[in-house]
Amino acid sequence: MSLRQVWRRNREEARLRRQLRSTLRRAGIAEPTDMLEVCERLSAIWPVPIVAAPFDLPAHGPFGLTIRYAPEPRDEAIYILYQRVATPLHQQHVVAHELGHVLGGHPLEPVNDLSEIDPSGSTGTLRRTSYNSRVEREAETIATVLLGRAAAQEGVTLPSNDARDHRLRRVLGDKVEWL
């Protein structure tokens, strides 16, 4: 990879981080949080709801997939399905990665067989198993940003929930460069 390519990729990643910061602010997400809550909050500002749910995916298949599903036109939603038997940490990563596809505006592939789900309402799915493409790298970058500082939040507990304590938690428990 040439120096120019590295520079271009770094610029693209910086642009992606700025866009993600803006989207998360609009959704009211100011600090690291659980990916299911991120989905819930993003649903408030996204054109359709974003729902993450555990699912019994085949063991030899992907750990997660994203489906845009509309059994009825007014009931359209984006479903992020993740492997039910994966560890909780892996589930968080899978949801963050699939959110990366959603937030990145990645196109859906045609659905061929979703025998476990009523296929008549599905308009497409994201089914990829390789990180070699631009969209996979972009989704992984978004996942990394979403999860990058989440662990810092878990170790800080406060005696109360007033504004000073909240500020103290932000200052001591979370780095400014989280996003």
Q: What is each residue range found by the language model?
A:
Residues 79-81, 85-94, 99-133:
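Active-site-flanking segments in enzyme catalytic domains
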Residues 50, 80-82, 95, 99, ...:
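Generic hydrophobic secondary-structure signal
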Residues 30-45, 52-62:
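Short secondary-structure junction/hinge motifs that connect adjacent elements
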Residues 4-42, 109-179:
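Metalloprotease/metallohydrolase-associated module, dominated by Zn2+-dependent proteases
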Residues 48-90, 99-105:
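Active-site scaffold of zinc-dependent metalloenzymes
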